Amino acid sequence: MALPWVEKYRPKSFADVVDQEEAKYVLASWICARFRAPKDFCTRWAKKKDKEILDARAVLLAGPPGVGKTTLIHALAREIGYELIELNASDVRTAERLKEVVGRGLREGSLFGYGGKIVLFDEVDGLHVKEDAGGLEAIIEIIENSKVPIVMTANNPYDPRFRPLRDISLVVNLKRLSEEEVVEVLRRICTSEGAKCEEEALRSIAKSSLGDLRAAINDLQMYLSGGRKTLTVDDIKRVGERNPQLSMFEILDRVYRARWFDEARAISFNPSFDWEQYFIWATETIPVVYKEIETMSVAYDRLSKADMFIGRIKRTQEWELLPYALELALGGVSQIKSKPRLPPFIKYGFPQRLLILAKSREARKRRDVLVEYLAQNLHVSRSYVKSEIIYVLGVLAKSDSKIVERLSKALGINAIDIKTLL
């Protein structure tokens, strides 16, 4: 099963990261000044002596998608022998969860003799300050108390909401790659894969990527999928150049109508593809497409196995398992022996799960506010309120109808809100 080329050809060393020399010098100077790092690494890369760099508590790498922000930190950790603790800040949003994951990672010993640890908060601009239950404040608190390097990435960290984060961090801007730099990387990959790629074809891919190297590599892998060993300009024209906007309805239709396995698998290379959203939509659309119980059963079996891989990935951070999950979820669901002939038009409905979450959003927000209020006034954690106190209050309310009124008066909370909570 093919590993995504963005992972296969991810730079293994600091020097291998394409361009971004200024960012490398700043990052290395900060690491060498404030933490331990190999002497030869510091001699080569620690070129900056600015007070702003040396005094920074954390580093925030800023730049458009695909310029190497995350890759730079992976290469840095490998180069200096540090264990990387990586979190996507837009996935782990709450203060409690952030502290739990980071704390566990810092407490646990390493099995591989790393010289230290470095924490990476990826995509911090994915946090929604109001909705995400103290996530931003938690990151700031972790930075202020941390004794290990904290690095963050963001596409656009200059939103006013992230001012507190910028105030305690050194913002390092990574520039968009030139067309020539992207072509050079694509050329090396073609050589490594034993593929004969026309120069104009590579330039076409690079031009449409707009400096996003990750997108360009994904496109190249898509064009050369299925064991193809040649790439011409005509191939690009026939398949079509990058389309950055593909709705979930179009993604589903392409998956179900794919004529062969690699065609379905290649959907994951599209920049619009979101595998978490895909799993939600696929779960509810399989019965719409496959009417026969046997076919439906096979599709669900493969999707559930893919979901098991995703669960393990989230628990262990073994992202090398992702290709296996995507092959099952895309090619596995698409290519079924008893697959029927599909009609010209399939009406895909919007997932009920997402509709329910959207409708209940306000109720859930009110519930969270009430839980927070109870936690502060009773001097317990929010998880304790949810797991213990709400249950006990619910039992008491069933045996004594007046307890809700007494709670309302004692805590100064609307009785209707308390009933909603229970």
Swiss-Prot record:
UniProt record, GO biological process: DNA replication
SMART domains found in the cross-reference section: AAA
Gene3D superfamilies xref list: 1.10.8.60, P-loop containing nucleotide triphosphate hydrolases (3.40.50.300)
Alphabetically ordered keywords of this record: ATP-binding, DNA replication, Nucleotide-binding
InterPro entries in alphabetical order: AAA+_ATPase, ATPase_AAA_core, P-loop_NTPase, Rep_factor-C_lsu, RFC_lid
Residue stretches spanning the membrane: none
Keyword Nucleotide-binding belongs to the record: yes
Binding site for ATP: G63, P64, P65, G66, V67, G68, K69, T70
Entry similarity comment: Belongs to the activator 1 small subunits family. RfcL subfamily.
Role according to the record: Part of the RFC clamp loader complex which loads the PCNA sliding clamp onto DNA.
Protein's UniProt name: Replication factor C large subunit
